[in-house]
Structures are given as C-alpha cells and as structure tokens.
C-alpha cells in the first residue's frame, strides 16, 4: 500500500481511477479505513463482493491498509456457493456493493454511517503478508484458495512494467472483473506505475469501441471471446498495448489482429502466478505468432517429462508464484497442468491443457488443434472440443459450436483436413457456449452435456 501513499505525495493531481486523482483516492481510502476500523477490528480475514467500480477499489485499499486479508468473491456465484466459500475460509464479515443481492454484513453505503475511529494504517506490509485471496476452480470441481501476498504483487508489477514499458499518459481500460487477477492486476499496475485506469462496471462492446477510438484509453486487457467481437471495429493507432489472455487464443484471430496492426501482447498466466508470467508483442515477432511469448523477468520455465518431440508438462518458478494453496503444502515449482514446449529462442508454445487432452484408442487428440482449424471456417463464432466416454475407444471427441455454418458443412470441412481419429463423433450447435465471468468457455459444463 506504500504505492498509494507515495503517488498521492508525488503526483497528487494526476488522475488514477476514472476521474479521481491519486490524492482523492488516498484521502477516500483513509476516510473509509477510519469508518471500517472498529467494525473490522476482530476480523483478520474479510470478504468483498462487488462489481467493478472505483468504490470497490477504494474499499479494498482501505481493508488492505487496515492489514486485512481480503477474499474477493466472484459476483456470478450462487448464494450456496458464496456461503460455502465463506464457511470454508472462516470468513464472518462480508462487505458488498449496493448492487449485490446477497445479504451482506455491510453494504458500501453502510460504511459511511459507521462511527469513525483513528486507525493505525499499515502502508508497508511485510512481503509474505497475504493481501487478497482468490478462489479458483479445480479439476475436481472443488475450489482451491490462492493466497496472493505483497511479494507476489510487487514482483508482478515490476516485471510487467519492465516488459511492456510505462508512459505518463497511459490509461488502462478495465473491462475484466476486478475480483479476478486479470482485472485486479491492472489496478495494481496502474497504482505502481502512477498511471490512470478507467474502470467499467462490465464489458460493454459499444462503450469499449468508443473509448478506444476516441483515444480516451491507450491500453486494454481482453479475453479472446471479447476481442473476436470488436477487433475489426477498433483503431490500431489508438492503442499502445492490447493484453490478450485468459484462455487458448484462436490462431485466425491472432493473424487477423496482426494484419490489422493491433499491438496484441499474447500473455500466459494464472491466478497462482498473479496474472501474466509469459508475454510478447505479436507485431515485434511475426515469426512467433503461435507462441505465447517469453518469460517475464524473474520467471523460470521448465518442461518436465518431455515426449520425443520435447513437449511436456509446463512448470513455472518465480517470485510471483504463490507459496501454495491455503491449507495445503508449499510449492517451489508449479505444475500449470498445460502441455507445451520451448523453442530455441525460449518462446513458449502451449499445445493443450493436460486435463483437456482426449485419448482415443491410444491416440492423443489436442482440442486446440481442431478448434484453431475450425476458427478458420467463416462464420464460426466460438467452439470447443470435449471428450465423450466411449466403450470401444475410451474417449471420442465431441464438438460444440456457435455460428452460421451447419453441421454438414463443418463435417465436410474437417474431414478434408484431419486424420479420421481426430474427427468429432458428434457436432452440436448452440446459440452460445457457456462462459465464466472472465469470458472463458466452461468446458466442464460442456462435458456434462456430453
């Protein structure tokens, strides 16, 4: 939290969150902390449930200045899921924005009716102190809790700045959820860099296009499903950075963005590493478009158990890496669950998530390969290949898609380009594929459909 105090002193009138300056955010943070001090005194760990807003950031900053661990809850959770997460993590105090319907102990508007008390604020917490906790889904369906420490935050913002650079006029558009690393990392980078962040409550296609094309912002983070909808409508010259990650990125989308001159930084990271660990600008490396980039400063990549083609399990080690999931053993080398390889220039290539690989009759089928191919067929909006249990082959591929081509057209297209064992046994058309709050396709939901 020392960054907020420092920026308020060095650049008090510089815009930080939307139209609020660093000094205004600092003052509001101190005021909010004074209101929360008594009410939160006996709680080391609290939960925050809110859509994106400057107010959410200020309440979070206040809780962090009070030395609290803050569980950030996904606003798309059901009431039962929220209760489960609060119980599992021994959280007894929930603060929520006024827009949230789940019954909270305090709403944002309640905070300022609380009695104020002089709070001792910790602007320089210990590196190993937990700042926020984010719950991430696991292959078992049971969530895992990722403790994000100040050491992880500091390592990330410094490495990100060194990789993508910083300009005084930078203004990063926040359309990804701030309860997720993809959104929160933007706020923390902007805080560290003394630059502006423009927070939107959610992804609004028309608003995003307008803000980019009128040069209100020059940086934005998106996931592929978002970019696919807007890339043809945004002006490349208005952007300095377009950070793209969150799921596997269709190759035809990257090729289209490259042709358009969009400064796409493909990125690879996860909650456990507090966002990006690997990245690169596609315009600077046209021969590496299928890669996800090179390691950020301080990040080590190891490929374990490689096959004959040197593809194996991707492991990461870095100061941005969590020590371990809450209530589980520490990790020194993190198994990402992805399969990939490094080339001679240390660019990383992802073949697939290990858990998504389909093994049919002893043959490995990589869904990403088939999905990338299908995205090159005009009219395909989104698609996902998932396994279906089969008594003869063990598993067979099942394809879900949204778009204008019919099933017969897709069958014909794929059969001319793929080995027979890779062809989907069934193709199902949907209006839209299920997605989470960050826009990732929910493959586990599709597997249940299978």
Tell me the role of every PLM-derived stretch.
Residues 419-441:
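AMP-binding/adenylate-forming catalytic domain of the ANL superfamily
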Residues 318, 339-422:
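AMP-binding/adenylate-forming catalytic core of the ANL superfamily
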Residues 22, 131-158:
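Conserved AMP-binding A3 loop
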Residues 154-171, 179-219:
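Conserved AMP-binding/adenylation subdomain of ANL enzymes
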Residues 5, 10-40, 47, 53, ...:
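Conserved AMP-binding/adenylate-forming core of the ANL superfamily
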Residues 13-15, 117-135, 142, 165-171:
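Conserved pre-ATP/AMP-binding loop-to-beta segment of ANL
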Residues 278, 294-298, 306-333, 363-365:
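Conserved ATP/PPi-binding loop(s) of AMP-dependent carboxylate-activating enzymes
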Residues 219-222, 228-286, 300:
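Gly/Ser/Thr-rich phosphate-binding loop
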